């Protein structure tokens, strides 16, 4: 809670920063992608709580990284750090800065090192990647000082910090596509003409059902919910066959992975074109997994992975239909409206009177009312379902 400050290289070290592009050209891309993904994954992790005087104190794991990995001087006073860099709301690990750094890797990195997978990861490797991410933060600050774009700033702040419940996304999509969409008689006669069997179209195009798709994503989200509060010191790239070889539906899972993956070189052109758009992570949202071409895959972040439950799924469904079919997703909005109506009806219970959508206006010029209403005595609450995306096709 409160304002959180992202630190730059100059804030932490107070000395000239290394040349970012030159340093990127020297490092092993395969190793760097692994470290970036791992550091993003532990950005919100806490150390084991300290118990003192009948209370528990939670300390961000980031504090240990400041001390043990970067070796930042604590300047102890009465046993407590006086260096402001150790404040809990001053951060050296940032989702946005690491994703920007990842774009820089795709632009300026040495792609020949993607095949060099026989490496170890040391404390200095972690320190180097964090330092370069801090250089990125300085570069962003310099750019904003010269030319600050309020729209881009609000855009990125909203999308990165708005974190809807993943469980809510899963349940919503399952209810809409796994329940309501099964039978067009769930809808009024005037809506049935817009009906599309999205689950059948999805299965035909991708070879997996929407339910199987969501089950795969749930499995891949598990590592982000673990209690692991330490660095691995090994690659977090995972071998596809080793992970899924014992699965009954291995082939189906691999099909799901292929619809959500890209090789780093496939994202190069997008990264170049959007280098100056600090808010644009569309490429990572289209492909939340990276493939190294040697049978290994890497989840970029929990942020990009959770997006696959909603916005990414929407566009996968859209791709099941011709681009000329302008009404392909009209029924998708009807599904969302019905979902909101059912939620509102359930919320009414015995305390409120539920009123469904109805026609208003003169005969021949009718319009539909809001999607649902809740009434209690002489008070009326109107409920109108509106969905939107702050990015384009992700």
PLM region descriptions:
Residues 1-334, 338, 342-346, 350:
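Acidic, metal-dependent phosphodiester-chemistry machinery of nucleic-acid enzymes
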């Amino acid at each position: 809670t409160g304002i959180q400050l992202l630190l730059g290289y100059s804030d932490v070290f107070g000395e000239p920063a290394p040349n970012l592009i030159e340093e990127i050209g020297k490092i092993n891309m395969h190793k760097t992608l692994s470290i970036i993904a791992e550091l993003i994954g532990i950005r919100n992790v806490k150390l084991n709580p300290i118990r003192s005087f009948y209370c528990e104190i939670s300390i961000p794991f980031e504090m240990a990284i400041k001390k043990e990995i970067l070796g930042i001087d604590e300047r102890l006073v009465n046993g407590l750090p006086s260096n402001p860099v150790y404040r809990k709301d001053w951060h050296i690990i940032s989702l946005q800065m690491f994703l920007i750094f990842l774009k820089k890797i795709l632009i300026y990195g040495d792609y020949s090192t993607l095949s060099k997978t026989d490496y170890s990861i040391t404390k200095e490797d972690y320190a180097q990647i964090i330092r370069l991410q801090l250089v990125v933060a300085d570069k962003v600050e310099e750019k904003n000082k010269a030319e600050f774009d309020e729209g881009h700033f609000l855009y990125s702040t909203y999308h990165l910090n708005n974190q809807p419940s993943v469980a809510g996304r899963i349940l919503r999509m399952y209810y809409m596509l796994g329940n309501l969409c099964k039978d067009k008689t769930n809808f009024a006669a005037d809506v049935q003409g817009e009906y599309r069997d999205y689950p059948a179209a999805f299965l035909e195009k991708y070879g997996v059902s929407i339910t199987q798709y969501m089950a795969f994503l749930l499995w891949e989200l598990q590592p982000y919910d673990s209690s692991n509060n330490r660095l691995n010191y090994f690659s977090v790239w995972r071998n596809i066959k080793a992970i899924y070889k014992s699965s009954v539906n291995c082939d189906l899972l691999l099909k799901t992975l292929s619809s959500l993956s890209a090789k780093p070189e496939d994202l190069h052109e997008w990264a170049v074109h959007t280098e100056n758009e600090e808010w644009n992570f569309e490429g990572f949202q289209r492909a939340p997994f990276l493939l190294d071409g040697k049978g290994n895959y890497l989840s970029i972040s929990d942020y990009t992975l959770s997006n696959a439950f909603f916005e990414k799924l929407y566009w996968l469904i859209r791709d099941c239909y011709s681009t000329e079919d302008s009404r392909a997703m009209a029924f998708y909005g009807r599904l969302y409206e019905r979902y909101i109506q059912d939620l509102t009806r359930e919320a009414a219970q015995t305390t409120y009177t539920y009123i469904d959508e109805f026609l208003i206006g003169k005969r021949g010029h009718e319009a539909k009312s809001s999607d649902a209403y809740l009434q209690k005595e002489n008070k009326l609450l109107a409920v109108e379902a509106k969905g939107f995306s702050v990015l384009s096709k992700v």
